[in-house]
Amino acid sequence: PPPPPPLFSSRRRHTRCQIQSRGLGDVYKRQVLAGDAYYSNLSDFFFQVVFVATAMSIVSGAVAERMKLWSFFLFAVILTGFIYPVQGYWKWGAGWLDAAGFLDFAGSGVVHMCGAAAALAGVLLLGARKGKYGPQGQVNAIPGANLPLAALGTLILWLGWFGFNGGSELKVSDVGEANAVALVFVNTNMAAAGGLVFALLLSRLWFGKADLTMALNGALAGLVAITAEPLTPTPLAATMIGAVGGVLVVVSIVMLDKLKIDDPVGAISVHGTVGIWGLLAVCFTNPDATLGAQLMGIVSIFAWVFATSFVFWFAIKKIVGIRVSEEEEYEGVDISECGLEAYPEFTSAE
């Protein structure tokens, strides 16, 4: 009988990962799964492991400073083991979204919007940090603890994105594919630069200050925006796609605060709002893309991830709770949950 369909496939050159939903045991038996002279199915599997970890890391930023550690770990198992693979199969497993013509090269929707939708569901049930919003609706800034470290983290992400997008070609077997990877690298970098510059300019015009956190999120927004299709745009088009992402992330962060949706690092805006823009932007550069298919992918992925995440977050909240106590939040979750201080150099001994 014919084998069952693969769990994931690459969007790229019609190569399909043969790691099947019933075949994960092959990985644990350390059997080398078939590929060809230039492509390994096992490398495709590893990419999916990294991608789902990326989606879960988006959630971690949005629920920071008030989430129970073990409740977070429990949801991580659910997202990585169930929620993500289902919608991942829809596109990268030759599923119905792939058949419908939905395009997502490296995961603006499958990875980034997925993580943002799961984060939004959790944040709505979790609530805002204490003191974030005043009784009259005012938004109180809670500055990050270490901006140089945040800048370093953004640089690391920027560099890592070359592997995220360029590696999504999955194989380099001839000069054409080598040139394709090089173009992906260039477009990825240009989009990040465009996002950073335009987020910085908008924050200066809007707030009167060159906001570093907005600039850093602008760079990430540019990267997310180009992830859906980094191969077909020209470098100039990639810059503009990233620039629009940089503008959108600033507007989205401000609007979410007005709605009292507390996202400490702007993860929902960076990966959700801009992830949607990235999927729509494919229509401007890829002649194979259709607006209908892209909208279908956006709605279906968001609806699946948000609905299932909300159900599981709600169940966890009712069974074990998801939020630390007010005293633990004031003390710091690093101390209350882990028994360690993240920044002991700033704590005076009594």
Task: Outline where the language-model segments fall.
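Extramembrane terminal tails and long inter-domain/linker segments of multi-pass membrane proteins
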Residues: 132-142, 316-350
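Hydrophobic alpha-helical hairpins/lids featuring a short glycine-rich hinge
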Residues: 38-77
